[in-house]
Amino acid sequence: AHSRRNEKASLKNIFDLCEFFVNLHVISKPMPVKKKKSVDLSTQPIGVFDSGIGGLTVANAIQKVLPHESLVYFGDTAHLPYGDKSPDSIKYYSIRIAQFLMQKNCKMIVIACNTASSIAFETVKDFVGGKIPVVDVISPVVEIVTHNKNIHKVGVIGTKGTIKSDIYAKKIKAASKKEVASLATPLLAPMIEEGFFNNKISRSVIASYL
């Protein structure tokens, strides 16, 4: 009975996390399986990954909303930035990371990377095979934009991979009649990774793009 209560409490935390991401859709649904011994989800961590340290902002937000949850963060600094990598490479890296997080017994995977979310989300979902939920960072932005009646024009900046995928424009236009303008900003990710943000250099780079 205690294990069942812990499982229910942990599942509530997962739903709270999804609500925090603004009605984020949990794409992966558990596949029908034979009944097994119940697992205490409260002891399993939430896996978060990004191409570098940028996803730590997502991990930090999760910890604020779910302070009792443990996290496993994977920053793939060996291959950053993902934005200039081929789709096949990004899918390969994402699968390897998902495999690592599953080996760490994570009960959920959060793809805290726009490039990986736009290119490898379906690949990761297929690899996981419905064993655990997989969520991305694109869906909540689309939800906010499409449901806000005061937003009529949307500007999207991102890595070359994210912009080339056109994922934001496709999803926003599919759910609304809003105008979308996209711009690749390949210098932003490495600049942030190197610690150049909120200073003269970062402001100059941003100004040159805008």
Model feature map: region roles:
Residues 32-210:
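Non-catalytic structural scaffold of enzyme domains
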Residues 1-9, 14-28:
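Short, low-complexity, charge-dense intrinsically disordered segments
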